[in-house]
UniProtKB/Swiss-Prot annotation:
One of its GO terms (cellular component) is cytoplasm. GO terms for molecular function: iron ion binding; N(6)-L-threonylcarbamoyladenine synthase activity. Keywords: Acyltransferase, Cytoplasm, Iron, Metal-binding, Transferase, tRNA processing. Its cofactor is Fe(2+). This is tRNA N6-adenosine threonylcarbamoyltransferase. GO terms for biological process: tRNA threonylcarbamoyladenosine modification. Belongs to the KAE1 / TsaD family.
């Protein structure tokens, strides 16, 4: 069984093609991505209208490239991100997927973007055991309990305000590091002291929700620190600020992820989402998982960011689990809950 996946929830137009191996894994046949990040960089962040127009221009050429790389005329099934994401961006991918599914006369599966970030790990590390997944990106920060990729995912916790990746972008903009902020902050932090500034760790008190996150206070603390230095006529050390901010984010993310794994009784932690490409998040996760006796699974950075392969992979797992196709009348859902792996109608 060969499955094509289409991803258009934000600023990447991704088309991936996989072959289901029948053992809980997929073989990667094609992974084509067209990104509009350079267009958004001019505005300091993702502009929904710009993203939608970029998807319109890129979707068909990207699909054609993926088919050519895979060496096939059409897939056996087609999966698409139905949500969550930007409304206009989702609409482009869903419309294309419906049109091609009808033209090719292949089954159509409307699947969850967040579930794809978990599923894609199986391409690199094999069948997925029961696990806790930490998903971190510009729009999402979630702790998930995954028993089976073909079954509903349980959300253990999420951010109550800013996503971690969003905080990275805002702090990078404050420091004049440009967009996207994650890679820029990570690079700046390499020359800084992560213990230089004691930035706060949000929602880590004894009365706070064990598995939820908050990054707005941290973002504000960085802004106030910079303002205080400027008022005093002192020079800010951008590397120290970047390293200290990055440490505060990584500290909370990894501490709560390990805690969640212990709480639900699993021995595997999976990282996913574009922000998990951050070097400090990965390093601290490795350190804390080793101390806790947990197995850490982290896909290579290309598979952590948005791509069509993750959607094809989730579609393949759902099909193998006996899921019925979605109706072509299904509508995209920008606010789709992570507990809904597939939308049928």
């Amino acid at each position: 069984m060969i499955v094509m996946g289409i991803e258009s929830s934000c600023d990447e137009t991704g088309v991936g093609i996989v072959r289901w191996n029948g053992d809980g894994t997929c073989e990667l046949l094609a992974d084509e991505v067209a990104s509009s990040v350079e267009e958004h960089a001019r505005y300091g962040g993702v502009v929904p209208e710009v993203a939608s127009r970029a998807h319109l221009e890129a979707i068909v050429p990207t699909m054609r490239r993926a088919l050519a790389v895979a060496g096939i005329a059409k897939p056996d099934a087609l999966a698409v991100t139905i949500g969550p994401g930007l409304a206009g961006a989702l609409l482009v991918g869903v419309a294309a997927a419906k049109a091609y599914a009808a033209a090719w006369d292949v089954p159509f599966y409307a699947v969850n973007h967040l579930g794809g970030h978990v599923s894609v790990d199986t391409l690199e590390h094999g069948p997925m055991p029961p696990c806790v997944a930490l998903l971190v990106s510009g729009g999402h920060t979630h702790l998930l309990h995954v028993e089976d990729l073909a079954k509903p995912i349980v959300e253990l916790g999420t951010t109550v305000d800013d996503a971690a990746g969003e905080a990275f972008d805002k702090v990078a903009r404050l420091l004049g590091l440009g967009f996207p902020g994650g890679p820029a902050l990570d690079a700046a932090a390499q020359d800084g002291d992560r213990n230089a500034i004691p930035f706060p760790r949000g929602m880590t008190g004894p009365r706070d929700a064990r598995h939820d996150f908050s990054f707005s206070g941290l973002k504000t603390a960085v802004a106030r620190y910079v303002e205080s230095k400027e008022r005093a006529g002192e020079v800010c050390s951008v590397p120290d600020i970047a390293a200290s901010f990055q440490e505060a984010v990584a500290d909370v993310l990894t501490m709560k992820a390990v805690r969640a794994a212990r709480d639900v009784g699993v021995d595997t932690l999976v990282l996913g989402g574009g922000a998990t490409a951050n070097s400090r998040i990965r390093a601290l996760a490795e350190e804390r998982c080793a101390d806790a006796g947990l197995t850490l699974r982290v896909p290579k950075p290309r598979l952590c960011t948005d791509n069509g392969v993750m959607i094809a992979s989730l579609g393949a797992h759902l099909i193998a689990g006996g899921a019925a196709p979605s109706l072509l009348t299904v509508a995209s859902d920008p606010g789709l809950s992570v507990a809904t792996s597939q939308v049928f109608s």
